[in-house]
């Protein structure tokens, strides 16, 4: 959030802020940070640095991005460069491969608590992120079982997204409906960002129900 706030007034300042954070603990950052650094560098008039971040992400780390994010205006200075085009082509192919293999994942394997909390991630997140975000709410209570539903649509390397359409929410609705007959005393569903939309659509347009919705 600080990076985005700084970028509103100064791309160079935002770039330096994020770069400092990355250099202080590089292992804590992944594909999205490299992408932000590339965009900030491009928008700050540093095309070589922008290209270097994309090279590191795509060529060195074997990550990939959704095709449309690599057409961002901040990356426009790179659009005619052969290396950028080659990197984008490689990323696009990896994305297509990921889409062809991907499917929705529901972590539930069986009932082992009285109550269930179903976590729904937001865009640029995944099921593991959702579980980690909501785990502190439940604490170490043995009466609650935490599960997550992950979208079938890749957003980037290791992350997924929901579409605001008439189909994407179906995976969430199906997970909710499957849980209704498992004998839980209470079912609570928590969503973040786009996950909130998926939960609301599930309740509005299907027979999926829960005892409480928590929307962030």
Task: Annotate each predicted stretch with a short phrase.
Residues 115-182:
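Serine-hydrolase catalytic machinery in alpha/beta-hydrolase-like enzymes
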Residues 1-2, 37:
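Structural register within alpha-helical repeat arrays
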Residues 185-216:
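Primarily recognizes the serine-hydrolase "nucleophile elbow" in alpha/beta-hydrolase
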Residues 59, 63-116, 197:
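A domain-start/cap signature at the N-terminus of enzymes
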